[in-house]
Amino acid sequence: MITDTCVLHIEEVLELLPHRFPFLLVDRVLNFEKGKFLRAVKNVSFNEPFFQGHFPGKPIFPGVLILEAMAQATGILAFKSTGKLAPGELYYFAAIDAARFKRPVQPGDQMILDVEFIKERRGIARFKGIATVNEEMACEASMMCARRKEI
């Protein structure tokens, strides 16, 4: 049973992530449970700047940016699960394993980002992420993020 659910709109996402256009890849958070999971949305628009070159006549959302969107969702879950960081600390993307791409993501798609907390040890947290479009898996990966002083 979900006991601590919430919706975070873009204004709240901007408070949690340092990313900004054109690299902010989470539009809103549909729900989450602290220390457990988070579900977010990325609305894929033809106006995304990378579609001009990836690929002309057959625009496909770059796989590395699907992974980045999942990593940003992971960062939000980490922030919401642990509360405030110490001054000068950030969560940094630390590792990715077993990334698999199952279907292309195209303009007009709505990508659902599901990330799940697996475990945390000494400031390093492991997560599993899945991106879906129309309930079809587009990508899955295991990820880690680390709480560290700002560089």
UniProtKB/Swiss-Prot annotation:
E.C. number(s) listed in UniProt: 4.2.1.59
Gene Ontology BP terms: fatty acid biosynthetic process; lipid A biosynthetic process
GO CC annotation terms, alphabetical: cytoplasm; membrane
Tree of life domain: Bacteria
Enzyme class: lyase
GO molecular function: (3R)-hydroxyacyl-[acyl-carrier-protein] dehydratase activity
Catalytic reactions on record: a (3R)-hydroxyacyl-[ACP] = a (2E)-enoyl-[ACP] + H2O
Family: Belongs to the thioester dehydratase family. FabZ subfamily.
Annotated protein name in UniProt: 3-hydroxyacyl-[acyl-carrier-protein] dehydratase FabZ
Source organism: Blochmanniella pennsylvanica (strain BPEN)
Species classification: Bacteria, Pseudomonadati, Pseudomonadota, Gammaproteobacteria, Enterobacterales
Gene name in the database record: fabZ
